[in-house]
Amino acid sequence: MTLSPYLQEVAKRRTFAIISHPDAGKTTITEKVLLFGQAIQTAGTVKGRGSSQHAKSDWMEMEKQRGISITTSVMQFPYHDCLVNLLDTPGHEDFSEDTYRTLTAVDCCLMVIDAAKGVEDRTRKLMEVTRLRDTPILTFMNKLDRDIRDPMELLDEVENELKIGCAPITWPIGCGKLFKGVYHLYKDETYLYQTGKGHTIQEVRIVKGLNNPDLDAAVGEDLAQQLRDELELVQGASNEFDKDLFLAGEITPVFFGTALGNFGVDHMLDGLVEWAPAPMPRQTDTRTVEASEEKFSGFVFKIQANMDPKHRDRVAFMRVVSGKYEKGMKLRQVRTGKDVVISDALTFMAGDRSHVEEAYPGDILGLHNHGTIQIGDTFTQGEMMKFTGIPNFAPELFRRIRLKDPLKQKQLLKGLVQLSEEGAVQVFRPISNNDLIVGAVGVLQFDVVVARLKSEYNVEAIYESVNVATARWVESTDAKKFEEFKRKNETQLALDGGDNLTYIAPTMVNLNLTQERYPDVQFRKTREH
C-alpha cells in the first residue's frame, strides 16, 4: 500500500532531544550529529576547558548581534531517508523549566552519559520528566577515549537509578589510551577506532565475526579475548533489545563511543532513525489527535525572549501535531478564540533561521509573538480543543522580590505576571501578606527576570532571601476538609501567576508533616498550563 504524499512526509519525521548532565558531552554530540546530517561541514573544535570558555564567549557575542539565539534551539537535518528534528535542552548555566517543557514536544530522547562518572543528578531529574509520558530513550555512553568505569557497572547503575532496563547494542573494546573500538552485538561486527579523526566523518574499518583472527590481529589477543569473555557475561546478564519495550519506555538501547573522537555517534543515529517513533498522537481535553489527520493542530511549548531590547519580539515555539502548515494559513488560537493569519513562521534548517513555506507533524515552527501567545497555547484550524500535558514544575529556588521605588508596585506585578505566562519564572503572592515571591528552577532565571523588569517594564527590583524550601499546588475533592486546611494554613498559602492555590513550605519536614496531617488534600509537583 503506497502512502499519500502527506503521510510519507509524516513517516519521515523523527523528533528528539538530548538529555544529559552538564559536561557529559551534549554539545559535542550535537555537533557530531549535525556533521552526519551534513548540516555542517566540519565540527567546531572545542578543546578542553581553556578554549571551551572561548567558544562559549564567541557564541554570546554572536547572540548579541543576532538579537535572539534560535539556531541552538531547534535543528532540522536529513539522515538516511528521514528528516530529523533535534531540540536542544539548555545546559547548566541556563537550565530552566524550558528544558523540562522541551521534553513534552519530542517523541524520543537521547541520554548522554559520561562513562567516567555514570548517572549524575541532572540526568536523574530529566529522566523523571520523560517518565511522565513514557518517552522512548536511547543511551550513549560517552568519553570512551578516557578511562571509564566498568561498562557492566554503568549498565547496572542506569537500571537501578533510572529504573529502565538496558539493552547493549554495541560493546567497548578497551578504554582510554587502549580504546580500540566497539563490537555490534546484533550485526556481529567490530568497528575499529582511529584517533585524531574527530572533526570529520571517517571511514571505519570493520571486522566481521567475533571469532575472526583478524580481530585478534587488530586489537591484540588479550583485548580480543577479554571482549569475548565480557560478551558471554553481557549476553547472559542483560536485556535483549525489544522494539515494543523500547517504545513503551521500559528498556533503552545502549551505544558506546566518543563524541569528541566522532566514533559511535553514527551507530546511535542509525538506531534512532530505525527504531524511534514517527510523530506520535497527542492528547487534548476532548480527544486524541493523530499525526495522520490532515487538519492542522499544534501546541506552544516554549517562548524565547529577545535579548535585544530594541526588538521586543519573542519567538513562540510550536510543535506541529497534525496537518500541514502552509504559509499564510489562518489558524485559531483556542485560548482567545481569535483567528490569526500566520505568514511569517520560522523554521530551523541546519542552523539558519528562515521563513518556512510548509511544515509537517513533528516539525517545530517559530511564531513571532508580541505578548499574545502563552506557553501551552493550542492552535487549530477551528476546532476548540486544548492539548494537555505541558507542565509547570514546582520551583526549587525561591527569593522575595522587592522594589527600589515602592510606587511602582503595579508595574512590578504586571511584569511578573507576564514573565510567568511566558515561562521565564514563577511568581507567588502569599495570601496573608503583600510579599511577592519568585520561584525558579535555575539561578540564572533570577538574573534574567531583574534585567527584563528593568528593560521592558522600567522597574528596578532587588531580591532578598526568603524562608521557603519548596512549593506544591494544592487541591481537594473534599470541600469541607479543604476549607479547614485553608483556614489552618493560611500563612503558608499563596496564589501563583495563574491564581492557582499553592502551599509554600518553609522546610521539607514541614511539607511532609502537612501532607500526613491532610491526607484528603493533593500536593502536586506539577501543574498543567
Curated annotation (Swiss-Prot):
* Cellular component per GO, a single term: cytosol
UniProt subcellular location: Cytoplasm
Domain tr-type G: residue ranges: 11-280
InterPro entries in the cross-refs: EF-G-like_DII, EFG_III/V, G_TR_CS, P-loop_NTPase, PrfC, RF3_C, RF3_dom_3_sf, RF3_GTP-bd
Q: Which CDD domains match?
A: RF3 (cd04169), RF3_II (cd03689), RF3_III (cd16259)
What's the chief localization of this chain? Answer: cytoplasm
Binding-site list for GTP: 20-27, 88-92, 142-145
Which keywords fit this entry according to its UniProt record?
A: Cytoplasm, GTP-binding, Nucleotide-binding, Protein biosynthesis
Q: Which SUPFAM superfamilies match?
A: EF-G C-terminal domain-like, P-loop containing nucleoside triphosphate hydrolases, Translation proteins
What family does this belong to? Belongs to the TRAFAC class translation factor GTPase superfamily. Classic translation factor GTPase family. PrfC subfamily.
Described purpose of this protein according to its UniProt entry: Increases the formation of ribosomal termination complexes and stimulates activities of RF-1 and RF-2. It binds guanine nucleotides and has strong preference for UGA stop codons. It may interact directly with the ribosome. The stimulation of RF-1 and RF-2 is significantly reduced by GTP and GDP, but not by GMP.
Q: What is this protein called?
A: Peptide chain release factor 3
